[in-house]
Amino acid sequence: MKTFTAKLENIRRNWYIMDASNKILGRFASNIALRLRGKHKVIYTPHIDTGDYIIVLNAKKITVTGNKLSDKKYYHYTGFVGGIKEQNLKDLMTKRPEYVIERAVKGMLPKGALGKAMLKKLKVYAGTEHQHAAQQPQVLEI
């Protein structure tokens, strides 16, 4: 018996909608990462992108446990001397709630070109409106 390897021309990608309302950030992000990688499919192959497209709605309503709203810090470097900036989760959720979910999922995907291709299939929106009705996405309850 030979080992099965998925081929790009045989992969069917589905579109799913996930609602982030009252979901815990880490658990929600790990479920998204699993589906973006395609690990829920029988044809999963580690070096080929077999995952589906995920649309996340209501990113501004996601929750975290404990004191993470005030304690969790997000850092970025501007490129200048002394230019490291920090922002806590509460401030980031008011300005860019989509980024919080994207960053959590990005950390759970492979690093490199394959992970970047997987992350492009993630579409995150702060509210309930999205522009992917033509793809006829299915609602995915978790």
UniProtKB/Swiss-Prot annotation:
<protein>
    <recommendedName>
        <fullName>Large ribosomal subunit protein uL13</fullName>
    </recommendedName>
</protein>
<dbReference type="GO" id="GO:0006412">
    <property type="term" value="P:translation"/>
</dbReference>
<dbReference type="InterPro" id="IPR023563">
    <property type="entry name" value="Ribosomal_uL13_CS"/>
</dbReference>
<comment type="function">
    <text>This protein is one of the early assembly proteins of the 50S ribosomal subunit, although it is not seen to bind rRNA by itself. It is important during the early stages of 50S assembly.</text>
</comment>
<comment type="similarity">
    <text>Belongs to the universal ribosomal protein uL13 family.</text>
</comment>
<dbReference type="InterPro" id="IPR005822">
    <property type="entry name" value="Ribosomal_uL13"/>
</dbReference>
<dbReference type="Pfam" id="PF00572">
    <property type="entry name" value="Ribosomal_L13"/>
</dbReference>
<dbReference type="GO" id="GO:0017148">
    <property type="term" value="P:negative regulation of translation"/>
</dbReference>
<dbReference type="InterPro" id="IPR005823">
    <property type="entry name" value="Ribosomal_uL13_bac-type"/>
</dbReference>
<dbReference type="InterPro" id="IPR036899">
    <property type="entry name" value="Ribosomal_uL13_sf"/>
</dbReference>
<dbReference type="GO" id="GO:0003735">
    <property type="term" value="F:structural constituent of ribosome"/>
</dbReference>
<comment type="subunit">
    <text>Part of the 50S ribosomal subunit.</text>
</comment>
<keyword id="KW-0687">Ribonucleoprotein</keyword>
<keyword id="KW-0689">Ribosomal protein</keyword>
<dbReference type="GO" id="GO:0003729">
    <property type="term" value="F:mRNA binding"/>
</dbReference>
<dbReference type="GO" id="GO:0022625">
    <property type="term" value="C:cytosolic large ribosomal subunit"/>
</dbReference>
